[in-house]
Amino acid sequence: MMSRAFKHPPRSVVRLGAFIALIVAHPGLWAQNQPSFLAQSALPQDDGYAHLGVASCASSVCHGAMLERTSTTVLQNEYVTWTRHDHHADAYNTLLTDASKRMATNLGLPNAHEADLCLDCHADNVPTAMRGPEFDITDGVGCEACHGGSESWAALHTVATVTDDELRQAGLYPAHDPVEATALCLSCHLGNEDKLATHKIMGAGHPRLSFELVTFLELLPPHWERDDEYLARKRAPDLLGQWIQGQLTTAKSSLRLLRTHLVDSNTTLPELAMFDCHACHHAMSDQRWQPSKLTVGVEPGTPRLNLAYFAFVEPLAQSLQTSGSADIVPALRALNQSAHVSPEQLSDILNEVSDLIDETISAAHHINERIDGTALLHRIAEESALGTYRDYSLAEQAAMAMNLLLEREALWEQSRPAMRAVFASLMNEEQYQPDSFASAVKVLLEVLPEDAGRTKEL
């Protein structure tokens, strides 16, 4: 749950500052790395290659060195970083806790640590026939869960002349690519057509899920170094480029989930995991209902779709000046309303929203200069202060976006107290108050430099 993560807001000032300096030195990286916004690779769990196991990577001359090495293109202590600091290494062990045992009982499962329903995201749960001699399911979310089965690329990836394309063809998942990384992370941190943390699973005790690519990568203990060599080899975009690709890829994935679970499911009761949790789950005495820019036309007491993965396409489209940017908010309102009318009407609106997202993707594809990050920061902050992002999941996404934009625009240090107050307003989602979040963002706006495009009076 992001409320836990917000206790330590993701800033990593030294590392991010160095990364931003490198991007300034390589301004063409975003334009060169033309993203497809559509993942092209099979996910590691379904890649068809044998997974040889974490132990096959852990030699001290491979990725198990105790200290970072500077004479090679990789640090070579990746295994140590993962096993000591990365929560993915404990993902399987989470299934052994009392809370997981209780969830398994509630779901009618004998044991969480033996159920595919749980192992699919808490381990590298490939078929038994695809497990190598050193494979151990208890390793949790290990190397090959993200980098793909190493059956064919293990021997290749140490060859100096091997290309990224050759490694990719051998099954190495391109986790450095923001679009591919988003698809991979979303497969567990949101869900896809094959696996989903359903309302039933959350009702059994599983925490609410959320995701934003840049923030989650910054919270991940890095087992890589974003230096000149990395940027040249990976052609990585900067923080804003990552955020753009993550947002648009997530939006498209979310559309597919809505279609799968609300249009094509043929069930009487819709999959409630597609809706905003806090629209229903709050104390009856908490009189928080108030229409906002995104909920016009939705009546009090009506379950609302979780728009957190769509809403920020709108300020992005405004920044890109797409022809349909003014149509995005009305389309999102219609999306919310159509969910209570008929699957047919919902399907039509999903098509409309998809077209608007595709237009934004096309604009992002062909942008030849940097988006004004400060103007985008102001736009998101102003909408937050006005109450557009009142719902917790929306406020959460807005906070993560503002935080990374402050980093990208070298404004984080001067705004640190104000940004920390924004995070503090989100610390406990059960006690969250929309007005407190909006007030905190108003204070943040006061310490930001004036933006020439600012038009809203708060």
Model feature map: region roles:
Residues C57-S59, C118, C143, C185, ...:
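Short cysteine-rich clusters marking metal-coordination/redox-active sites
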Residues T105-E144, L411:
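Post-signal peptide N-terminal segment of secreted/secretory-pathway proteins
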